[in-house]
Amino acid sequence: MPRTDNDSWDITQSVGATALGVAAARAAETESENPLISDPFARIFVEAAGKGMWSIYADPALLTKADDLEPDLRGRLQLMIDFMATRTAFFDEFFLAAADAGVRQVVILAAGLDARSWRLPWPDGTVVYELDQPKVLDFKSTTLREHGAQPKAELVNVPIDLRQDWPKALQEAGFDASRPAVWSAEGLVRYLPAQAQDLLFERIDALSAPGSRLASNVPDSGFTDPDRLARQREDMRRMRAAAAKLVDAEITDFDDLWYPEERTPVDSWLRERGWDVSTATFAELMARYGRSIPQGAQDSMPPTLYVSARRRAG
């Protein structure tokens, strides 16, 4: 179903269901022979949600049937697992580096089923603010506490739609804009219209004291190229049809969730506002972590740029 201006969702619907797909990919990577990451909670989320399109990543029995339906499906699924594994490792390392540098305020925007509050070794005194739709945060917290999990930092849930006045809600929850913070906008930006992207980073910039850090994965150049989009949509259509047969469930059409619009380049925008910025493309990040993109699959993933930044003093 196409997006609307005021749409909302729970964990099994629309954008919320993508969080389960991410969790399923993290579970598959965690349980692989040589995992890049360890997320012991990912499998818990997938099992708590029940059967759905996310099952295809986390159920080895389904993968054995994939080749009979679509020769390229297994490779595409592994590429998605690699994508999520490298993305997760990138953000994990970013957070831990900020913690080592003494930053004790953490803000996770569109937190989804990100379980870093529970699984990363946060230093004493760290406060993690998680922002997302109320139903998404409730599912996560309830599921983890039912399994005896306890956060490894002081966790503050801020249940709010990021299209609303989340800076006000964040500060009312205890966030101190006079102190450095570490921000993440992981798996978020392509689900925002271009104007909403601009507003998001304007708000982050306004709340960031010197020494603050920011990481995000954002649409890269070529994201809106019509020919590339057509190839990606056709590839996704074939994979979605095969996957739907495997799980006997409707598969979300991600084309309906993304906004393929021309956007302000986030890296240059941040540099102009006093941030030191580093970037890596999806292919560069995959290579950094020893993963590769299968031949012929270059267009199956949207062009993505990984951005990490630090706010300079003065």
UniProtKB/Swiss-Prot annotation:
One of its GO terms (molecular function) is methyltransferase activity. This is Putative S-adenosyl-L-methionine-dependent methyltransferase MAP_0256. InterPro entries: Ppm1/Ppm2/Tcmp, SAM-dependent_MTases_sf, SAM_mthyl_Trfase_ML2640-like. Its EC number is 2.1.1.-. S-adenosyl-L-methionine binds at D132, D161, L162. Belongs to the UPF0677 family. Exhibits S-adenosyl-L-methionine-dependent methyltransferase activity. Keywords: Methyltransferase, S-adenosyl-L-methionine, Transferase. It holds the Pfam family LCM. One of its GO terms (biological process) is methylation. PANTHER family: S-ADENOSYL-L-METHIONINE-DEPENDENT METHYLTRANSFERASE YKTD-RELATED (PTHR43619), S-ADENOSYL-L-METHIONINE-DEPENDENT METHYLTRANSFERASES SUPERFAMILY PROTEIN (PTHR43619:SF2). It comes from Mycolicibacterium paratuberculosis (strain ATCC BAA-968 / K-10).
